[in-house]
Amino acid sequence: MAAITYWLGLQGFARRHHNIPFRRRIRDEQAPEYEGLSHRLKQLMQGQHLYRNPNLNLISLSAELGIPPYQLTQLLNDHFQQNFNDFVNTYRVEEAIRLSRDPAYAHLSLLGIAFEAGFNSKATFNRAVKKVTGKTPRELR
């Protein structure tokens, strides 16, 4: 028993730099299903403006789609190449840009527009705008 443990330890040490892929990718037979899901997800985000809900989270969005959270995470990572927060914040930044150019929202400060777009804090808004556009929020107005 000790010899097996010793041998396994040596094998592990010898292969410590080998990358072992552990993440499942969307298989070819799943691709049509994921195309449909991505279309439904875009419709929900654009049509119902779910991103404007500051309490939107992975669980509530996956429930809205009728899929388990892990499947939504896989869809976002593989199809959109984004994590959940980046995906939602991209919609929020686009909404904030649209609102900042709308005369009906001219009376709001940038922070007010951020809250209208679904952001919870100024810091998150600033960080997301910089990440999505490469500009600061003030440069957007």
Model-identified regions with their sequence ranges:
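Alpha-helical membrane-embedded segments
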Residues: M1-Q11
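Membrane-proximal linker segments that couple transmembrane helices to downstream signaling/catalytic modules
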Residues: L10-A117, T124, A128-K131, K135-E139
